[in-house]
Swiss-Prot record:
ATP binds at residues 8-18. This is 7-cyano-7-deazaguanine synthase. SUPFAM superfamilies: Adenine nucleotide alpha hydrolases-like (SSF52402). It catalyses: 7-carboxy-7-deazaguanine + NH4(+) + ATP = 7-cyano-7-deazaguanine + ADP + phosphate + H2O + H(+). Pathway: Purine metabolism; 7-cyano-7-deazaguanine biosynthesis. Zn(2+) binds at residues 189, 198, 201, 204. Its cofactor is Zn(2+). Binds 1 zinc ion per subunit. It comes from Proteus mirabilis (strain HI4320). GO terms for molecular function: ATP binding; ligase activity, forming carbon-nitrogen bonds; zinc ion binding. The gene is queC. Its EC number is 6.3.4.20. Belongs to the QueC family. NCBIfam families: 7-cyano-7-deazaguanine synthase QueC, PRK11106.1.
Amino acid sequence: MKKTVVVFSGGQDSTTCLIQALEQYDEVHCITFNYGQRHKEEIEVAQRVSQLLGATAHKVLDVSLLNELAISSLTRDNIPVPDFKQSEQSDIPSTFVPGRNILFLTLAAIYAYQIGAESVITGVCETDFSGYPDCRDEFVKALNHAVNLGIARDIQFITPLMWLDKAQTWALADYYGKLDFVRHNTLTCYNGIQGDGCGQCAACHLRERGLHGYLQDKNAVMDAMKNKVGLK
């Protein structure tokens, strides 16, 4: 029986990963982290979406200790969330939560170890990403190697979206017939607004630009996505 663990926030990327995983694995376990994020709606949305899609199980872990160390506009009400133009002007935006993916992937691997899952799936990507160093392919591979050494188990970190742009990520959701579901039920917005979001923050801008790009040339984007992912 094939099992996997999806690092799940209830946003566009992790939901698309969950949709694909449900087609590929016998058991799909979601893990969501409460790290004191600015908008608790994220956790509620993640729980609702995983249930609607039919995940095998959904674990929510309290990692609020991260909030004590990682100062970010996603964890502090007194730090404003930058709009897209402000984010573009910074090498690492204030929305970056230092150590977040280090912690999340490590804990997800421990959970995978306990339930006998062969892999951990995460929706990080280098294309159209927000300048976060812990979304890079080299980081994920390096951490995967270190974690496997530490637990003496071969658990694979899988990044289905690593080389897809946002338009192609929308195409992947559409390939599985879930574009409208992802658009209306997920929460990607840094300001905590479900669906199409606030339209001002970097996350909303990338999401909307990707959707527009896909809808403008669906066939070409779909073909490009299939070639990258290896779908027919």
